[in-house]
């Protein structure tokens, strides 16, 4: 139990209710304690998280601690990741993911090697947006974890860190991992590349059995920004899923790949308005006056968002005419 001392009369007034036999009373008292926003009240919150008999009280304590980054709080939340009740584990994981300081990240870091996969994945998730350089090594090791959620979170860390040394391992996961979400995440993380080294892996992802991976591959090829990807993206305009076609069209616009003009013009007649809109915007990005005829025909499209995109594209091409 944490040493608990306070002179705050508002906290002292809550103590009998914090020790009440009724879990509902204790939970409401914790909420009122947290509303005081007094650091002196933290020991009662961390103790409730650690030892209260009622899962609903422990879960509430985990939620209420999300705004605090004191070491005792971070340690208590990390320990709660292994709680026997799922609501407590989930609440602790969410609160940890809200932390912003590198100091908190360093306290979380040892938990990425915990025996429990949920703990490992949650610790990695909490570290992701902190951009803690010390997390790169453990994340690289976690790419080989036997549990897909752990691998997925490790990919996220390496992507946020823009850790280029991880590119070969990420390319392998993008092509070969058994889990669709891991392949999708790894494919997206390849966007940190600055050369064509990752193109073979992205081309493979563009032919993945899962459309979500193909969609991510098309997006990432646009981010990498290499014109060599143009032909593969043009082929992706024929994908069975319109979501993949949309991302391919957007990527072709980003690449200003003029060889896609005919295929993008055809998409202006597609039955899905979002795809017509993206095709119009991409044609504007190409900067080729040859697209003007198709765009002018699309000015009467039945969807206002498509018409707006057509107007934008026509304005872009005025100087190219």
Regions found by a protein language model. Give the residues of each.
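Alpha-helical segment of the N-proximal tetratricopeptide repeat
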Residues: 13-37
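Short inter-helical turns and helix N-cap capping residues of alpha-solenoid HEAT/ARM repeat scaffolds
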Residues: 21-22, 53-54, 84-85, 115-116, ...
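Ankyrin-repeat and related helical/solenoid repeat scaffolds used for protein-protein interactions
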Residues: 238-312
């Amino acid at each position: 139990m944490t040493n608990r001392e306070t002179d705050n009369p508002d906290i002292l007034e809550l103590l009998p209710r914090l020790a009440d036999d009724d879990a509902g009373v204790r939970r409401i008292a914790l909420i009122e304690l947290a509303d005081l926003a007094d650091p002196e009240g933290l020991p009662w919150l961390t103790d409730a998280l650690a030892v209260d008999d009622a899962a609903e009280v422990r879960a509430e304590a985990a939620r209420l601690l999300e705004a605090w980054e004191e070491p005792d709080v971070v340690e208590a939340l990390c320990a709660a990741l292994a709680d026997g009740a799922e609501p407590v584990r989930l609440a602790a994981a969410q609160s940890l993911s809200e932390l912003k300081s590198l100091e908190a990240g360093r306290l979380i870091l040892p938990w990425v090697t915990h025996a429990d996969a949920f703990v490992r994945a949650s610790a990695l998730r909490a570290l992701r947006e902190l951009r803690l350089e010390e997390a790169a090594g453990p994340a690289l090791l976690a790419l080989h974890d036997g549990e897909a959620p752990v691998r997925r979170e490790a990919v996220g860390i390496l992507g946020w860190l823009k850790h280029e040394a991880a590119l070969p391992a990420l390319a392998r996961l993008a092509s070969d991992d058994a889990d669709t979400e891991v392949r999708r995440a790894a494919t997206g993380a390849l966007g940190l590349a600055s050369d064509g080294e990752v193109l073979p892996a992205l081309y493979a992802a563009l032919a993945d059995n899962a459309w979500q991976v193909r969609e991510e591959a098309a997006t990432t090829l646009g981010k990498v920004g290499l014109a060599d990807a143009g032909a593969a993206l043009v082929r992706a305009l024929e994908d069975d899923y319109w979501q993949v076609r949309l991302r391919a069209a957007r990527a072709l616009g980003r690449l200003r790949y003029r060889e896609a003009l005919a295929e993008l013009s055809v998409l202006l007649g597609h039955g899905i308005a979002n795809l017509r809109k993206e095709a119009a915007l991409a044609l504007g990005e190409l900067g080729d006056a040859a697209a003007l005829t198709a765009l002018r025909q699309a000015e009467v499209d039945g969807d206002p968002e498509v018409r707006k995109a057509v107007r934008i594209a026509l304005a872009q091409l005025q100087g190219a005419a």
